[in-house]
Amino acid sequence: MLSLAACHQAASNLPGDSTDHQPWRGIARDEVVHFLGTEPFWGGEASGNELTYTTPENQDGETITVSRFAGRGGLSFSGNLAGGAMTLAVTPGECSDGMSDRTYPFTVTLQIGPDVRQGCAWTDHQGYRDATQKE
């Protein structure tokens, strides 16, 4: 019984509204999520149960089957890439790729095995802004 109480107490420290039990709806299930990162360069898109991961060395990319999960504060796609576990987490928040004047509406964290990368994302309905565009 003590371990259950301890687990419950730790769960109260989770971010967000603890009474909100609805999955995040910031990206519709039918939207295509485009993502990119630099240092090293990588990118791709996720749609439905498929994710295509691209690099300069593999511009056609590798397409894998993924599971989509909408949590309380974002969206994730999980599958196996290059023989290892892969998760792409998408969360709302302004993002800059550091190489262009674009501002993206989502940040992404890509983990392939032990390798973790940060990047940006957008959808066809929620695009990026160039510095010359007004909000």
Positions of predicted regions on the chain:
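C-terminal partner/receptor-binding element of secreted or periplasmic proteins
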Residues: R102-E135
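Acidic, glycine-rich flexible loop segments
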Residues: A85-T103
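Processing junctions and N-termini across compartments
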Residues: M1, A89, P114-D115
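Post-signal peptide N-terminal segment of mature Sec-exported envelope proteins
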Residues: P15-T38
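C-terminal motif of bacterial Sec signal peptides marking the signal peptidase cleavage site
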Residues: S3-A6
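Central antiparallel beta-sheet cores of small beta-barrel/beta-sandwich binding domains
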Residues: D30-A89, D124
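Bacterial signal peptide processing site
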Residues: H8-A10
